[in-house]
Every structure is written in C-alpha cells, then in structure tokens.
Amino acid sequence: VWATPAQNENTLDFALDIATRSIDFYDEYFGVKYPLPKSNHVALPDFSSGAMENWGLITYRESCLLADPELTPESSRRFIATVIAHELSHQWFGNLVTMQWWNDLWLNESFANMMEYVAIDALQPDWHMWEDFATNEVTAALRRDSLDGVQSVQADVNHPDEISTLFDPAIVYAKGGRLLVMVRKLIGEEAFRTGLKSYFEKFAYKNTVGNDLWQELESASGQPIINLMNAWISQPGLPVVSVSSSHDAAILSQERFFIGEHQPSDALWPIP
C-alpha cells in the first residue's frame, strides 16, 4: 500500500490488512487464485474517481484508502473496506475475465457491487454488512428504475459516446448487484461458487458475454438461469405483483411499476 510522504505510515495499515485478507478470501471463494505476484494499492492526492481497478496497480482517492488508527471513525473504515474489496473483485471480474463489449458492463460492476458486501461480511461479521446492502443505494435504484426511459442493466451500446451513460450507479451497480444476490439465493451458495469457479477457469484471459456466465451457473445448479436472468437484466424497470382472491383461489398478476407519466408497457418478469 502506497501514499505520498505527507501521509503517516500508520494510515496505510488498515488498507493493507483489508486488502491482504480480501485477496485470501477471493482466492478461496472463487476457487481461482489471484494470478499476479503482487497487488499494489496507491493513494493519490488528486484523483477524480473514487478508485480504479488497474490490474495489479489499483489507484484510489486518498479518502478511499487511508485510515488514521485513532481518528478515522468506523463508518469511514467500513466505506474504505468496501472500496478495497470492490476493486479487488475486479481483478477477477473485469481483469482476469473481461466483457466482450460495453453492453455487458454489468459483468464487471454488478458483481463488484455484490462482492464487496460478500467479502467484507466474511472478514468483519460484526459490521453486519448485509443490513447496509438492504438499505444503501436501494431507494435510489428503485426510484430510478420506476421512471419511463430508464436503461436496463444490460444495455445496447452502438457508439463510443454512449459508453459513459452506462455507468449509472443506481442501475448497473445497485440494481445489478441485487439481481445477482437474487440468483445466488435462488441456486444456493455451493452451486453459485461452483459456477463461478468454472467460469473463471474456462474464460481466464478471454472475453465473455453475459450468457457465458449464466450458462455456467445453469450447469452448476440445474436451474433455467439463462432465461430467468436475461429477462431481468435486458428489460428496464421492475414488476409490482398484485394478489386478488376469487372464491378459494388466489390470483397473481404483475405489471411494470412506474412513477409519473409513462408509455404503456407489456414487460413481464419470471418471479423466482
């Protein structure tokens, strides 16, 4: 872990501990070892992004990496830990295996959004990270997803100018991460990890599309993941399910949930 000479050395200790343990965790969780001999984490005094997952040389804004052992509050430590775990997960999702084109950006960012919670919950169970996952970003994601014209998690990109619009924290990050938690819960932890291990082993140093991942999870679980998840990532919005009773039967129906004016929608989602 690196910083400028203006920083005290002890502000690097927390990041070093989290980074070291995160790599060990991912090695075991993914079943595929971190492929490089070293992982550098560099705090930059003037860095517009929060962090960037360059392979083997991750760069951070100073506030996203450095923690004073006496002055930094726990809330800031939790934030720093999730940023480190997020960027390190990209060493697998994004660097070891890279999406074929920008329409599958979610293969990088949705997974990193989920894995930062998976990793830090395992490393710091006393922080109860899944409580944060259930509240952080969710309201913004639901609000954004209820607007007409919002992009889907997997969105077409036909021109380089469209790439930057994909980095929507409410959709590709927050919504996508929670859809992955849905499929993880659906097929179970063992099948999920088996599918990921197969995915990394088969596609290491290659490019993939979303269906490559769904196929590995489908093979590992025996469940129809491809059709299920493509419906969720390829269409914008979210369903609201209504229940009505008729004599002794319950009738369930769904429609896309909107806030404000909107065009009619016939979108349907398979509910796992």
Each language-model region and where it sits:
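Hydrophobic alpha-helical and helix-loop surface patches within well-folded domains
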Residues: W2-Q263
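Short coil-to-beta strand junction motifs in C2/discoidin
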Residues: Q263-P272
